[in-house]
Regions:
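The beta1-alpha1 cofactor-binding region of Rossmann-like NAD(H)/NADP(H)-dependent oxidoreductases
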Residues: 56-67, 100
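Conserved glycine-rich Rossmann-like NAD(P)H-binding loop of the short-chain dehydrogenase/reductase
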Residues: 27-42
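Residue(s) in the substrate-gating loop at a strand-loop-helix junction
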Residues: 138
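Active-site helix of classical SDR
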Residues: 118, 154
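Conserved glycine-rich cofactor-binding loop
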Residues: 11-12
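Substrate-binding pocket helix/loop in short-chain dehydrogenase/reductase
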Residues: 93-95, 102-105
């Protein structure tokens, strides 16, 4: 496999696991993230397996997104696969108690950031009439749960954007699909609960949550299908999870 893949949010969780698996399968990688130290470690870890280029920027900053992606070196500039993985949840509050800063962060990262990166990547895909965009959504984009309000709204937006992309880009032969995970044990809950490790740990206690590697396996499967096959929308949950609010736990 000699295709070039760009992965946002590559320094942890699903993004990191996807980078590791793609490297093993000989994809050239452009890895994006906000934490330079983690990007450096990842490049050192994976650089012996495949060519790696790292980009340190925040997807919320559209000028930085455009600048970094437009200035990719020639060996990495023709992106074949975009994995829009960067995303976060901030807070778990009823709507009347929600933080405006939390709302801004979720909309800016989960929705606008995805759009900024996609906009920067698309001209090349359109010109060559080929490419594959994987949008990492969530089961929160398929239903709404108590106190999930704005996070669920942001992931419903990802679901709508994914559908819209697939319609708009059909004439160019670009594949577009979403992978929508349920409960995956990552730094997600630590970020949502702002470093409250005890509260974050309770989210995954009493059942086997998905691992980042599980989602990476699925992403690899999606992007390695024959080109006439497009997996447009995929939902994956742990066996113990039936919905956002129904999880069989044995405590």
């Amino acid at each position: 496999m000699n295709k070039t893949a760009l992965i946002t949010g590559a320094t942890s969780g699903i993004g990191r696991a996807t980078a590791q698996l793609f490297a093993k399968n000989n994809f050239k990688l452009v890895l994006c993230g906000r934490r330079q130290d983690r990007l450096d470690i990842l490049k050192k870890e994976l650089g012996e397996q495949t060519p790696i280029h790292i980009l340190n920027f925040d997807v919320r900053n559209r000028e930085e997104v455009t600048k970094h992606i437009s200035s990719l070196p020639s060996g990495f500039s023709k992106i074949d696969i975009l994995v829009n993985n960067a995303g976060n949840a901030h807070g778990l509050d009823s709507i009347e108690k929600g933080s405006l800063d939390d709302w801004d962060a979720m909309i800016d990262i989960n929705v606008k950031g995805l759009l900024y990166v996609s906009k920067a990547i698309l001209p090349n895909m359109v010109s060559k009439k080929a490419g594959h965009i994987i949008n990492i959504g969530s089961t929160a984009g398929k239903e709404v749960y108590p106190k999930g309000n704005v996070y669920c709204a942001s992931k419903h937006a990802v679901d709508a954007i994914n559908q819209g992309m697939r319609l708009d880009l059909n004439e160019y032969g670009i594949r577009v699909g979403a992978v929508n995970p349920g409960l995956v044990e990552t730094e997600f809950s630590q970020v949502r609960f702002k470093g409250d490790t005890n509260r974050a740990d309770t989210v995954y206690r009493g059942f086997q949550a998905l691992r980042p590697e599980d989602i990476a396996d699925i992403i690899l499967f999606v992007v390695t299908r024959p080109y006439h096959v497009n997996i447009a929308d995929l939902v994956v949950m742990p066996t113990a999870q039936a919905s956002s609010t129904i999880v069989k736990k044995e405590l």
